[in-house]
């Protein structure tokens, strides 16, 4: 455990130097604090060896050199980290033995053939993104990401619509997704489609429409996963929950998308438990460098394990993140 103090620019530069040094592995930033004064002002460098000194002696020395009053140290997060580390209340994970630069990544080229053009009358494009089961080395499902016909983002596509059209169009695009999956020939792979949660509430007969379109395009309801995003507040939760129950009764799977980025978070998870939970990519990005992100994801993993919810990490682009 290292405590670095100083101006932000110098501390960040020193931290990056330490992290880049080949003699150090698994260097993670646990916290970054902005205090009115240094905790060990003018002390210089102090080294403590827990293989030589007792935890009690080290802790006494740390408190001796501290420039904070004793009543402040008991509530200070930095001192809590120090005390936990010294006393061994939290197990120290073993250093990672992987070397990312020695890994070989294999790519399955065009597993579903060449891309398809727009279907007749199709109002938007779709990007089919594979969801991979890394331990088995295979694609477990495909997520249909909506795009404007200019290739623009979903936000841009929906902003181009009148407000009263948004939920109706959101629902209608799922029919095109199912048609695309049928034409592409996804076999037994699962298909995940994103849906604004309020589309299930504001569009009459939404569930019946989805189930009809799934069967019309020769897909099995158990093959389809409806991903509801956290980025929209759910009003009328009773109606939403009723729609969820109907979908599940038909065999359709449910997922919470972008978990950790939106309105509901854990509150939504207490009210309905999906088959899958997808951690927002902002939490996953550079997780190998962030102690807070690791702690949060560790808690999410524990929660989903207890609830038997399959967990998906969004946006993994580096071996270190995996």
Report the location of each language-model feature:
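The catalytic core of metal-dependent phosphodiesterases that act on cyclic dinucleotides
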Residues: 214-287, 307-322
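Charge-rich, low-complexity N-terminal segments
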Residues: 1-123, 127-128, 132-135, 178, ...
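Alpha-helix-loop-beta-strand connector modules within alpha/beta enzyme cores
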Residues: 296-308
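Bacterial c-di-GMP phosphodiesterase EAL domain
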Residues: 103-217
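Charged helix-capping and loop-helix junction motifs
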Residues: 206-212, 239-242, 291-298
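Short hydrophobic/aromatic beta-strand micro-patches
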Residues: 3-5, 147, 229
């Amino acid at each position: 455990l290292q405590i670095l103090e100083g101006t932000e620019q110098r501390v960040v530069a020193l931290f990056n130097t330490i992290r880049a040094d080949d003699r150090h592995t698994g260097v993670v930033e646990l916290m970054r604090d902005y205090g009115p004064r240094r905790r060990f002002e003018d002390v210089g460098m102090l080294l403590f060896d827990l293989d030589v000194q007792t935890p009690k002696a080290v802790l006494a020395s740390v408190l001796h050199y501290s420039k904070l009053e004793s009543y402040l140290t008991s509530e200070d997060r930095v001192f809590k980290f120090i005390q936990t580390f010294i006393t061994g209340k939290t197990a120290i994970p073993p250093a990672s033995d992987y070397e990312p630069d020695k890994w070989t990544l294999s790519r399955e080229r065009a597993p579903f053939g060449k891309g398809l053009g727009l279907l007749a009358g199709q109002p938007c494009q779709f990007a089919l993104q594979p969801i991979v089961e890394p331990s088995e080395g295979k694609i477990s499902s495909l997520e249909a990401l909506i795009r404007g016909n200019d290739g623009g983002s979903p936000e841009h596509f929906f902003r181009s619509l009148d407000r009263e059209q948004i939920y109706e169009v959101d629902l209608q695009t799922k029919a095109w997704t199912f048609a695309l999956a049928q034409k592409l020939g996804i076999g037994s792979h699962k298909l995940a489609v994103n849906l604004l949660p309020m589309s299930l509430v504001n569009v009459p007969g939404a569930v019946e429409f989805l189930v009809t379109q799934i069967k019309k395009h020769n897909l099995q309801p158990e093959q389809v996963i409806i991903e509801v995003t956290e980025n929209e507040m759910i009003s009328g939760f009773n109606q939403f929950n009723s729609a969820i129950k109907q979908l599940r009764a038909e065999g359709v799977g449910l997922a919470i998308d972008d978990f950790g980025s939106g309105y509901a978070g854990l509150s939504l998870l207490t009210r309905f438990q999906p088959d899958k939970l997808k951690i927002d990519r902002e939490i996953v990005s550079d997780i190998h460098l962030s102690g807070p992100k690791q702690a949060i994801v560790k808690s999410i993993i524990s929660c989903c394990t207890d609830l038997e919810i399959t967990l998906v990490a969004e946006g993994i682009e580096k071996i270190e993140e995996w």
